[in-house]
Amino acid sequence: QPGVREAFCLQTCNRVEAYVVTDDAETGMAALDRYTAGLEGVRREMTHEASLEHLIRVACGLESLVLGEDQIIGQVRRAFVTASEAGGIGPVMEDAITKAIHVGERARAETGINEGVVSLGSAAVRLARRELDDLAAEDALVVGAGEMGTLAARALAGEVASLTVANRT
């Protein structure tokens, strides 16, 4: 789109975020309007330092449903590669995203934020163990074979009487 010098999109099971680099905020907002039309109440707009701080918090797992979850850092990396291959990454985005990945890795290494329950799937399994008398006697259904569904299925495997994974494809 005219006026957009760089663009990056992060899509996970819990979020879709778009970042653009433009010469002025108005051009950036107009570029993003194409993708957020009709999504009243779910859009958050940030500029400059606030957007970098947010991306760092996302990479650290501080904005995740499960604090410190590990999947997000890999998702940021993959989105960075995809945007790079598409020609969307320039010096501003490269600096911001590599900084966010570095801080996310460092936060995990130095704080242990990702110890224990590190995904929504493992949190669900922990809750099921607590709520059900005998998980080994239960049948389990995991809906979806994406990243979270796979993590949940792995966490449940061997702990339930039977495990079924349902997927739309």
Where are these regions (language model features)?
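Glycine-rich phosphate/diphosphate-binding loop of Rossmann-like nucleotide-binding domains
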Residues: R129-T169
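Short phosphate-engaging motifs
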Residues: T27-G28, I72, M148
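Glycine/serine-rich phosphate-binding loop and adjoining beta1-alpha1 elements at the start
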Residues: E40-E138
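A glycine-rich (often HGG/GG-containing) alpha/beta subdomain
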Residues: Q1-L67
